Amino acid sequence: MERALLILKPDAVQRGLIGAIISRFEQRGLKFQGLKLMQVDEALARRHYAEHEGKSFFNGLVSYITSAPVVVAVVAGKPGTVELVRAMVGATNPAKAAPGTIRGDFGVDIGRNLIHASDSPESGERETAIFFQPHELIGEWNRALDNWIYE
């Protein structure tokens, strides 16, 4: 199964959008393999955003993601899951995100764009390893409705 890491950022948590956002992924047939509410510390934030270190916005990213609790989740599905998740999330700038996407429906500002999602299957695996220990993840499991979603 292909996996993507999701982070419901501080603005999503503070605005009470956790349930509304999570339900969208469940309704599309994706399976949650891990889910937790946590406070990201500076070291973890710097590790997660390491690819942006040295860029003008790096310190702002670290400061924001550590400012309040976040929800971190791993969703899994068939090949193409990361692409599906990215389409559901919408453009980085909520002003340019299509209606029907998470950012298009709930987002207000590019600096408060609600959610992070892995941008490739490789990133999904790398980011999952940053936020979850193997024992915190549920592997393959079947829901009663899976036969109605997947061929």
From Swiss-Prot:
Keywords on record: ATP-binding, Cytoplasm, Kinase, Magnesium, Metal-binding, Nucleotide metabolism, Nucleotide-binding, Phosphoprotein, Transferase
Subcellular location: Cytoplasm
Residues the record lists as binding ATP: 9, 57, 86, 92, 103, 113
PROSITE patterns, alphabetized: NDPK, NDPK_LIKE
EC number: 2.7.4.6
Swiss-Prot/TrEMBL catalytic activity: a 2'-deoxyribonucleoside 5'-diphosphate + ATP = a 2'-deoxyribonucleoside 5'-triphosphate + ADP; a ribonucleoside 5'-diphosphate + ATP = a ribonucleoside 5'-triphosphate + ADP
GO molecular function: ATP binding; metal ion binding; nucleoside diphosphate kinase activity
Entry's Gene Ontology BP terms: CTP biosynthetic process; GTP biosynthetic process; purine nucleotide metabolic process; pyrimidine nucleotide metabolic process; UTP biosynthetic process
Positions annotated as active site in the UniProt record: 116
GO cellular component, one term: cytoplasm
CDD domains in the record: NDPk_I
Signal peptide location: none
Chief place where the protein resides: cytoplasm
SUPFAM superfamilies reported for this sequence: Nucleoside diphosphate kinase, NDK
Enzyme class: transferase
Cofactor: Mg(2+)
Quaternary structure annotation from Swiss-Prot or TrEMBL: Homotetramer.
Purpose: Major role in the synthesis of nucleoside triphosphates other than ATP. The ATP gamma phosphate is transferred to the NDP beta phosphate via a ping-pong mechanism, using a phosphorylated active-site intermediate.
PANTHER family given in the database record: NUCLEOSIDE DIPHOSPHATE KINASE
Family indicated by similarity: Belongs to the NDK family.
Entry protein name: Nucleoside diphosphate kinase
Organism: Chloroflexus aurantiacus (strain ATCC 29366 / DSM 635 / J-10-fl)
Gene: ndk
